[in-house]
Amino acid sequence: MQSFELEEMALFLIRDADEAEMWIDRWAVSYPIVQTAEADSRQTISEWQHEIQTAFDHIVSKNIAVVAHGVGVSAFLAWLYQADIMTQKRLTNIILVSPRPEALPEDEIHTFQRVRCPCRTALVIAETNGTPRGWAQEQAECWHARLLQSPHSGKLNGALGGWQWGMKLMQEMLLSQ
């Protein structure tokens, strides 16, 4: 990416509505161009798709970095599955953090088994007490993501020191393109 493309890039943050304030909220006020969305575990796949599309429609930047957490991962992937190729081309990188296995409902078209990420993607889980590693590895392979472990524990839903580790990961992903 050229430097001017990085300057105009939007950060699309999709948070888990079931979580209290955390690092993703700090990112929302720390980045110049941000669009946010929330996903609730009680919503259906079609409601997630509508919610994410509504937020996505407000993004004018040509280049978009996506960061989703918890149920937000499910909502984003449900939306991505039905997104057209021109929309997918706007995605520069994706970071999926602590997806919840129970928040990936099976549907008649197998959305979460068929979706593929079209750009550099990291699936980030905690080193301990979080998303099961074996399950996460299978999902990473299915979604064309690279599985990474955060040096933290649990659902990665705290302040995490502003989550500098994640910002560094995003920067490395963008600059390596």
Where do the PLM segments sit?
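Flexible, membrane-associating and regulatory peripheral segments of lipid-active enzymes
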Residues: 1-11, 91-93, 168-177
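Active-site catalytic motif of lipid deacylating hydrolases and related acyltransferases
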Residues: 2-64, 152-154
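The feature captures the conserved acid-bearing segment of alpha/beta-hydrolase catalytic domains
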Residues: 2-3, 101-151, 158
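Conserved alpha/beta-hydrolase fold motif
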Residues: 65-68, 94
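Gly/Ala-rich beta-loop-alpha elbow adjacent to hydrolase catalytic centers
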Residues: 67-80
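A conserved amphipathic alpha-helix that caps or lines the catalytic cleft of carbohydrate-
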Residues: 80-84, 140
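A conserved short beta-strand
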Residues: 86-102
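C-terminal catalytic histidine-bearing segment of alpha/beta-hydrolase fold enzymes
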Residues: 146-177
